[in-house]
Design a protein with these regions (language model features):
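Carboxylate-rich, polar loop motifs that coordinate divalent cations or form catalytic acidic clusters
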Residues: 1-167
């Protein structure tokens, strides 16, 4: 009898927890798409910078959303400081005004204060990350570290493998 009471109390307790877990606040959510200015319907990545801007990488450009409108960054042959890529795969930042943008073919630096882009690395890139005051770039078999963005990267690690891509 005591086991049955315990089992009933336990089941009620667990079901109460489940009900509490399903309680949510009303969230006001507005969806944005190409009709509101997003450059492409396929979104590959998001990043929120230290100023509150939401950076959205799409297949057709880099988008900055300020909460109201989009600003789209695309290659412009007339501007040597424009972004060099359209298909944005990843965005990260250093929380000091610099963004790092990865495509399949390169990594590009964007200085928000100067409103200028410049290529940091060309060639296949598997991933990027900014951590411990350095930009980390992973290729198919190696990991590079940029401590000073004006100097060549340091080869941090290389996988001893005969395979094409490890990462």
């Amino acid at each position: 009898m005591a086991k049955a009471k315990f089992l009933v109390v336990y089941c009620l307790f667990i079901s109460g927890l489940c009900c509490m877990a399903n309680v949510t606040k009303d969230i006001n959510m507005r969806f944005k798409d190409v009709r509101q200015g997003l450059s492409h319907q396929t979104v590959n990545c998001f990043y929120q910078d230290e100023f509150g801007f939401l950076w959205i990488g799409t297949q057709d450009g880099l988008n900055r959303f300020d909460g109201r409108k989009f600003e789209v960054f695309k290659p412009d042959n007339a501007n040597p400081y424009s972004i060099n890529i359209n298909n944005i795969r990843q965005v990260c930042g250093n929380k000091a005004g610099l963004l790092f943008i990865r495509s399949l073919q390169s990594v590009t630096l964007y200085d928000m204060r100067l409103n200028r882009f410049r290529v940091l690395r060309e060639g296949e890139v598997a991933g990027i990350c900014y951590a411990h005051d350095a930009l980390w770039i992973a290729t198919g078999k190696e990991i590079y570290r940029y401590r000073n963005l004006d100097q060549a990267p340091e080869l941090f690690f290389s996988f001893p493998s005969d395979e094409e891509d490890v990462l």
